[in-house]
């Protein structure tokens, strides 16, 4: 693995990024915008360039090049995004390798400057397989249970403490401002802030931070690989639970296989907190729709009923009990 910082006065990125995420998102699937930059990256790493193809919509630019994938990160000079995403991804990919969790393998990584922007990049192997997004809807009950057991085994290895890496903490102010709660009642938002402030959190572990359908892939040998660690944080062990529910499409078979006895001490307190904390990911937005569907009510009724944190916990308890 190399870690290069290469300065280049000539413009290599074919675009102008305004200080908003929408501007960046207009480029992330454009091979034309990134081809000169990718050619330069391959040249400085003495790698042979093959056809560049767009691979998936993500918060950063991701392209397939033969049997490899290149991920190019939002440049800090453009403003609004967290400039630590590149360093976080590298650190947590190495954490995954150390803990025995399957993930893309870093071939090379570094920073390259094109005269206006500095881009972090990572080149990894390409994993041939099917995304959880496409695989899970085809599962029968046996396959659901098998997948949930495998995910539990993976996360038990991944969600551990690691004092050798430097990544953001879950309780940094910017990470506690989740827009998913913007449409909530003021009484709930005030109680959420108070609850977080007064909670004595357990020791932090490495949390994935964005464990959604598109970030889990099943290869041809039916092995599960985790993808995209740019939003990983040090957080309590239950931080990823919200995303796990979303990953499972809120399916009760997989949820119960993964979590086991939901009546155990503090389960619902911790589950509730897992909805209060995450800065990104599905949050409570997807959960509200699942609850509304099972309760046969309008989703706005769910929003209006959550007057405080205890109301949220009681709704979760009721939802778990109906099946």
Predicted regions and their residues:
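Short glycine/proline-enriched coil/turn segments at helix->beta-strand junctions
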Residues: 46-48, 65-69, 98-102, 222, ...
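Short, flexible/disordered intra-domain loops and linkers
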Residues: 22-27, 76-85, 287-302
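Juxta-kinase regulatory segment immediately upstream of eukaryotic protein kinase catalytic domains
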Residues: 2-47
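Active-site acidic catalytic loop and adjacent metal/ATP-binding pocket
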Residues: 58-66, 193-241
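Active-site activation/catalytic loop segments of kinase-like enzymes and analogous catalytic loops
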Residues: 238-266, 275-319
